Every structure is written in structure tokens, then in C-alpha cells.
Curated annotation (Swiss-Prot):
Entry keyword annotation includes Lipid metabolism: yes
Database matches in Gene3D superfamilies: 4'-phosphopantetheinyl transferase domain
EC number: 2.7.8.7
Species this chain originates from: Saccharomyces cerevisiae (strain ATCC 204508 / S288c)
Protein name in UniProt: Mitochondrial holo-[acyl-carrier-protein] synthase
Function: Transfers the 4'-phosphopantetheine moiety from coenzyme A to a Ser of mitochondrial acyl-carrier-protein.
The reaction(s) this protein catalyses: apo-[ACP] + CoA = holo-[ACP] + adenosine 3',5'-bisphosphate + H(+)
Domain of life: Eukaryota
Gene giving rise to this polypeptide: PPT2
Transmembrane residue ranges: none
Family per record: Belongs to the P-Pant transferase superfamily. AcpS family.
Length: 173
């Protein structure tokens, strides 16, 4: 069964779109090079604000694989940023902004980017969010059914200097 066939008829609870300028992320990685101890320290502070620990671990592995700044690194970090931005927009379609934690908590603690074995990007809810962030347990209680009955369908595309991310928050199959 094709992807489209499996997903026809699923209710969409929210949609988000974000576009980023890749040279902006290339500049950040050049200015705060992960291959320089001083730069690495500053880059870690920056990435902790929007990358989940699982994404930072994956980024560390990419740094080892690449061993220098490459478009793959720029695209990874920009893709994570763009997915977080558009996931917030999708969540705001069905969750009151007043009920959501600050963007930094949502980005670095609640959601993380993964991919399937075939390389298709995915955005996952961290099931440990309520335990890691007790201050926001009420969010988990109020919206637990949303997080257990819905998932993000995501798409990333890049061409030259731009990367675009789209998220649809949909009912699970």
C-alpha cells in the first residue's frame, strides 16, 4: 500500500511550514566551529536551546563522520531548526498557546527528529517529557490523548540556499 493510500482520510489537526536560509546556519557553524574547543563550547550552548539530546548525539556522530564543515552538517542543523519551528505552528492549531511550554522547552525537550531506515524524516514526541520537565506535567495530562493519538508527518526539502520544512499533525492510523 502506498504512503498516500495509507494516509487518505486521516484527520489533520495542525499544519506548519518553515523556510530557512542555509548560509545562516553555515555562518553559525563557521563562527562557532565544532572542531575548535572555544567554538564548540558556544555551539553547544546554542544547540541546547533547540536540539533534543538525541539530535545533539546524532549531530556529534555526523561531526565524526564528516570531520570538517560540510553542507550535510548545515542541512542537518537547519532541518532540525525548521522542523521545530513548523511543529510549533502545527501544535498551535490545536493546543492553546497558553498551555504550551516556551519554545525552547518544546524544541529541546518535547520533540526530536529521527529518520526511517530509508531516510524519511520523522518527528517524535519524547515520552519522558513529563518526567524530565515536571513543571509541564499538566500539559502532558491535558493533552496526553493528543500526543498518543496523533503524529507528525513531516517533509524536508532543500535547494541551493534554502531549506523548507512542512509538518502535518495527523491522527495516527
Amino acid at each position: 500500500m502506498s504512503f498516500a493510500s495509507r494516509n487518505i482520510g486521516r484527520k489533520i489537526a495542525g499544519v506548519g511550514v518553515d523556510i530557512v536560509y542555509l548560509p545562516r546556519f553555515a555562518h553559525i557553524l563557521e563562527k562557532y566551529s565544532p572542531f575548535d574547543p572555544c567554538g564548540r563550547s558556544t555551539l553547544n550552548k546554542i544547540t541546547r536551546k533547540f536540539m533534543h539530546e538525541k539530535e545533539r548525539f546524532h549531530f556529534s556522530n555526523l561531526l565524526i563522520e564528516e570531520n570538517c564543515l560540510t553542507p550535510r552538517l548545515h542541512e542537518y542543523i537547519a532541518g532540525v531548526w525548521a522542523l521545530k519551528e513548523c511543529s510549533l505552528k502545527a501544535l498551535c492549531c490545536c493546543v492553546s498557546k497558553h498551555d504550551l511550554p516556551p519554545a525552547q522547552v518544546l524544541y529541546a525537550g518535547m520533540l526530536y527528529k529521527t529518520q526511517t531506515d530509508t531516510g524519511v524524516p520523522q518527528l517524535e514526541f519524547d515520552k519522558m517529557f513529563g518526567k524530565k520537565y515536571p513543571k509541564y506535567q499538566q500539559l502532558s495530562k491535558n493533552y496526553d490523548s493528543l500526543f498518543s493519538t496523533h503524529e507528525f508527518l513531516v517533509s524536508l526539502s532543500h535547494d541551493k540556499d534554502y531549506l523548507i520544512a512542512v509538518t502535518n499533525l495527523v491522527e495516527r492510523e
